[in-house]
Amino acid sequence: MNYFIDHCTNDSAADFIVLASGLGGHANFWKLQIKFLQQYFHVLSYDQEGCHASDSLLDEQYSFQHLAQQVFNILDQEQITKFHFIGHAIGAFIGTELALLCEQELQSQPQFKQMLSLTSINAWDELDPHTAKCFEARIHLLKSAGAEAYVRAQALFLYPPAWISQFINEITQAENQQLLAFPPIHNVLTRIKTAVDFEINHLHREALEYVALHFIGNEDDFLVPIQKTRDLQQSLGHGTMNILSHGAHASTVTQSDLINRTLFEFYKSHNFIE
């Protein structure tokens, strides 16, 4: 599992921030955020297990607990004790499970890791029927028509129509690169199933009770209805919510400046940055 650390450009004593992407699983999903966040934080991004063409087949017990443990191990290895976390879609689920691991460590170890904040972008508390239908369509495409049909269709779930029209050449180039490194189909299906099955529960709520929570949702998200952002906030019991009118599911790409400003305002309002 590859991970990358981009150190803060202004403060060697800055806190760390961990970035977890969604279903695609790659660190480069965050390239438009990393340079911005580097002004204030040391930035840790990583490629999730099972997302490369050369990766082994995922175990049937693959879970977000497992994915969170991998991040926990990286934090151990790098001796990171305080950190912020940003997760896009299922990346936010990794963050919630990581909060549980930190809570367990707090109860058993004299030295422990502290999650300072968790930002969830276009995530959910439990799967919405609309999102379930989207996943069903993608699964059927992958099984019946193969990887190319799956990859060529994904822009429809991620980006606004006008953005696709404007950036079709860049989208096509990115799709071509993705096809060259497409992971085993078994792994894609396993990751989708894991996303479908995940639900927020009272243990997540308790572990995040004293963590600063931030929820970002997009009204024009075709994959995850905006109501799920509100439901997630309600399930976890507190936090700041920002609803954006445009940008769709992958607003970190299509509205990167707005996302970056929204993140900045959240961290500044909690005195995490000056």
Identify the role of each PLM range:
Residues 2-60:
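Conserved HGGG/HGGXW glycine-rich cap/lid loop of the alpha/beta-hydrolase fold
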Residues 44-88, 97, 101, 261:
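Active-site loop/oxyanion-hole signature of alpha/beta-hydrolase fold enzymes
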Residues 96, 100, 112-145:
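Flexible "cap/lid" loop of the alpha/beta hydrolase fold
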Residues 129-131, 148-206:
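Conserved alpha/beta-hydrolase catalytic His-Asp/Glu region
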Residues 209, 214-217:
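Short beta-strand/loop motif that positions the catalytic acidic residue
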Residues 219-224:
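Acidic catalytic loop of the alpha/beta-hydrolase fold
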Residues 225-232:
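Short alpha-helix in the alpha/beta-hydrolase fold that links the catalytic acid
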Residues 244-260:
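Catalytic histidine-centered segment of alpha/beta-hydrolase-like enzymes
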